[in-house]
Amino acid sequence: HHPSSAASDVYKRQILNDINEYLVFVSQVKNLSENTTKSYERDLKKLYLFLEKLNVTNYSDIKEEICSAWIGDLYSQNNKPKSIQRHLSSAKGFFRFLKKNNLISSSPFELVTAPKSSNTLPDVLSPEDVEQLLNFKPSNTIEIRDMAIVELMYSSGLRVSETVNINISDFEENMSFLRVIGKGSKTRLVPMGRFAINAINNWLNEREKISNNTDALFLNLKGSRLSVRSIQLRLKKMAIKQGLPPVHPHMLRHSFATHMLESSGDLRTIQELLGHSSLSTTQIYTKLDYQHLAKIYDKSHPRAKK
């Protein structure tokens, strides 16, 4: 359900208008050179086209994931890290300007970082990187657990805090959906890919050796719920062992969002999957929503392919 084209035209005019006002501001008030102003203009037009491609119709739709996806997009067009840094600072400046003028309440670009030099990866792994990360046979309890964690986080775009809080009772519909309690206690249902389901089943068998008197899905060897810190450390180790730079959990979520966006372009669905929309906990999902989510998911997620 995309907003009416009239509404999105108004938004397009507004964003172009805001960009122009910002350019006037930097050249006249901040007295920046014509060259700098021109490069801001080029960068912001690129951002505008990227947002247009995703059917973004509102500043409030621009979340951190979209900002990262844009950086990833610039990266994939072989822009040099220096140039990406500049694009990012243009965007940050523009959004700070919007915030100062009360057009937005907070800037989605604030926490987004660009690669410092050519040997650091952006915040998004390519599907091939994910493949490489997960390309090993787990040989002990911990590896079986870690495999399940990573497959699940990437499969469903979970935050690391959501991952540690999962209980076995949160699986629905013979394990094809997971009920996730996100920020602000908002509940959402996320589909799981085949790889994740297999990895979790392997872990559930293994988990019985450790404990069967707790509902927490992911445990340490002592039988208590795994901590966020443990997942961060294990993931970093796993990445290095697989010949990748250190990976942090949020990269899996960014990668999920980016890969889904790239292959489906369906921003609304992805916001729902990420738990960004204002779905209230009480909202009853209809079967139809499920089917739409599941359809987009199966078509778009690199590891959902049946």
What are these regions (language model features)?
Residues 104, 132-160, 184-186:
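Basic, Lys/Arg- and aromatic-enriched nucleic-acid-binding interface segment
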